[in-house]
Structures are given as structure tokens and as C-alpha cells.
Amino acid sequence: MSLLAVGTVAFDAIETPFGKTDKIVGGAATYICLSASYFTKKINLVSVVGEDFPRESIKMLQDHGVNTNGLQIKMGEKTFFWSGKYHNDMNSRDTLDTQLNVLESFDPVIPEAYQDCEFLMLGNLVPAVQSKVIMSLKNRPK
């Protein structure tokens, strides 16, 4: 099984009734890839980060078997950032801050080596970007 994940690799600041973080690695594509790494060995990532994104976090993805050749690093720019506060039920939350940064102009490029993906998982991107990804694939994945 092969998976192509296209979505956000980001920084998050999260507050819950049980604790608070200031700046941690987040993003839909990050956790799609990490979760999938327990079930398949062919995971391809397409996303974008700024030069502020830690290289050790990219290595962590690679150590989980994630192919990061499709991860764009925009020098001189900042990584997408989201901050939220979860309520007592841990199901509802308020967004406190969203900084699109590199995500605002993200134009996904699907490497040729990713074209044979069996499954496609799209993260929380605008529909036009999601559609572009689907249309750029030679074969329609599941």
C-alpha cells in the first residue's frame, strides 16, 4: 500500500483544561503521515514550511519512513501557525490565532515518484488546491 498525503505541516499552540503548549509541531499532513507509518512503509508527503521549521522535525518524519522529497522549504518565510483553546469537553474549541504564512501561496507540486500512489489523503487545504492535486495525478487513487 502506498499513501500520498498533501496538507499542512505546521506549528501549533494548544491550550486545554489540562495543559498548554506554546509552539509544537502540528499540521494535518504531519499526523496523517505519522499515523500511516504504523500501517504502511510507502508514505509520500507534499507540503510547505518556512525556514523556521526545525530540521530535526523533518528528520523525525523521515525516521518514520516518510518520503519528504515533496516538502517545500521556503527560505526567508515562516511556517503556518495555528493556536487554539479547547473547552472542558475537549470536543469544542476556539481558534485564537491563524497565521497562514507560507500556506497562503502554497502551490503543491507532486513529484514524479509520487504518481503511483494507491491512496490519497488531503488535509485541510482550500478546495481549489485539493482539486489541483487530484487533477495533477496521472492515476486516480482511492
Question: Where are the model-predicted features located?
Answer:
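Active-site metal-binding loops of divalent metal-dependent hydrolases
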Residues: T8-V9
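Conserved N-terminal subdomain of the carbohydrate kinase-like
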Residues: D12-K23, T40-L122, S136-N139
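ADP-ribose/adenylate-binding Rossmann-like module
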Residues: K142
